[in-house]
A protein has these predicted regions:
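Short, C-terminally biased terminal segments at protein or domain edges
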Residues: 1-129
Length: 129
């Protein structure tokens, strides 16, 4: 999967979260959940976009970690929304699954980037010797 495909999936997730929130009831608890998930569910798209424009590997890694945190939080809120039955499970479950898949991809990207950075660092150390 290339970065454009991943960006598109992140944007789709944000749009789906917005639509789900608009379908939530207007109870106090629903509105509290809505505020939380609208923030965490839309920020991965913006943060991933920023990561793709990073000026260095370290900057890229830091931005990916923000994406990871927001996706994890979104999974958390989606789980609560499902368990509290604030929205039909048939609507939330696919969203939850996509969020978890994106989280897995980002975690793998973080691990890959760290491994590559460490390898490059080791190569620089060897070159100095």
């Amino acid at each position: 999967m290339n970065k454009n495909d991943l960006q598109e999936r992140m944007t789709d997730l944000a749009v789906r979260v917005i639509k789900m929130v608009d379908a939530m009831p207007t109870t106090i608890s629903s509105q509290a959940m809505a505020r939380q998930i609208i923030r965490s569910g839309t920020s991965p798209s913006a943060n991933y976009r920023a990561a793709c424009l990073a000026k260095s590997d370290k900057d890229f890694l830091n931005k990916l970690k923000m994406v990871e945190e927001e996706l994890d939080e979104t999974c958390h809120w989606l789980n609560i929304i499902m368990r509290a039955e604030l929205v039909k499970s048939s609507r939330v479950q696919p969203l939850y699954q996509e969020c978890c898949e994106l989280l897995s991809i980002i975690v793998k990207s973080i691990v890959t980037t760290k491994t590559r950075m460490k390898s490059e660092e080791n190569e620089k150390m060897k070159a100095k010797l």
